[in-house]
């Protein structure tokens, strides 16, 4: 009996120690997750400053490491959003059902494109412009929409809520400005990462220190407008990524030509 009592006492102490250790580790994991979007934008930009064009052109592994963090972050966030959205019961009204399946399809598509885009963009050879575009522009396009949807929205069927309208509008506006700057001139590429990093950093500070606590409550129309704007930006970004990935794979492996050779040709009249 004494040995059993000693064993149970030891087991209880071990479980208590494990629980306490888990509770102590939670703040560390939360801190890592909080700074992940900021790091996902700044890390590739820092890699662009450290390594020159020749380094990126000669090393596919270096290109892969540079793009891994932003694409992994967006893939994980969209996968979590998709899982949370699908875990709730399907709504019955036709309008809610349409919204349910549309958003499910979009989140799943964003997840798949984020995962599959890493390899093609790493295989593609980076010239002078690409050595700035891929590590600076792409993360600033992919991270903010994923971060905005995961941090500022409560995505549950029939209960979609925007938690912070002011900073969400700011990030959306910054994303639009970002797109305009990038497609205007090559010299504006560095501003892309700066704008996205600052907007995400403001969101992090607002969550931690309640910078916009005194802002007026958002209306239903403003919440819907910000959500639609964010989804439109995400659709444009991931349509571009999907097209770019397919184009690169076809250029390397001639996939479209092989598909045409496999498909039966129409008989000549």
UniProtKB/Swiss-Prot annotation:
Entries under Pfam families matching the protein: DUF2463
Stored InterPro entries: UPF0328
Family (UniProt): Belongs to the UPF0328 family.
Name of this protein: UPF0328 protein ECU03_0020
Species, as recorded: Encephalitozoon cuniculi (strain GB-M1)
Organism classification: Eukaryota, Fungi, Fungi incertae sedis, Microsporidia, Unikaryonidae
